[in-house]
Amino acid sequence: MQKKLKVVTIGGGSSYTPELLEGFLKRYHELPVSELWLVDVEEGQEKLNIIFELCKRMVAKAGVPLTVHKTLDRRLALQDADFVTTQLRVGQLKAREMDERIPLSHGYLGQETNGAGGLFKGLRTIPVIFDIINDVEAICPNAWVINFTN
């Protein structure tokens, strides 16, 4: 029998989370994820709640033995994790708006993944990713970290 897997998704309130879950559900026999923990920050709690409810319905419809959890406590979620995914946006959509508008106001490409906007996003995101990695090293050092964050 294959080991059941625990996946922790940092930025679990993202609109990309249902697509990630869909992949786990479709490939359950090859990748037996039994726990999916959705983690977000307080500012993202409303979106986290919406995505959590959608994910529970998806699991029920699929009939797969996978439990979805949600929390704002990253360290709690990381206990015994096998995989940690990141798909976060530090500063929420307001920060993305600034990443795009500030360069545009100076005649440059307004984009969140490259150019000045990408630099702004990177400067906000890299310290948070390091904090996450430090927690992974301390709490679940054998977990694989998969970064989906731009």
Q: Where are the language model's segments positioned?
A:
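Short, flexible, mixed-charge acidic loops at enzyme active sites
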Residues: 96-107
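Metallocofactor- and cofactor-centric catalytic cores in central/energy metabolism, strongly enriched
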Residues: 2-97, 111-114, 118-150
